[in-house]
Amino acid sequence: MSRIVAPAAASVVVGLLLGAATIFGMTLMVQQDTKPPLPGGDPQSSVLNRVEYGNRT
């Protein structure tokens, strides 16, 4: 009976460690799954969404 207890206990410990690591990793992935805030453009300093190719005169 004691030959079974040690491997079973080791298996339980390894399973708990793997489960904890998985939960911790998933929590980190969910927390980092957000878009960074976009900086607002200054309309006085640039023309947004328009391509300027230079002086065409």
Curated annotation (Swiss-Prot):
Listed Pfam families: DUF2613 (PF11021)
Region named Disordered: 34-57
Signal peptide, first to last residue: 1-32
Taxonomic superkingdom: Bacteria
Keyword annotations: Signal
Protein name according to UniProt: Putative secreted protein ML2569.1
Higher taxonomy: Bacteria, Bacillati, Actinomycetota, Actinomycetes, Mycobacteriales
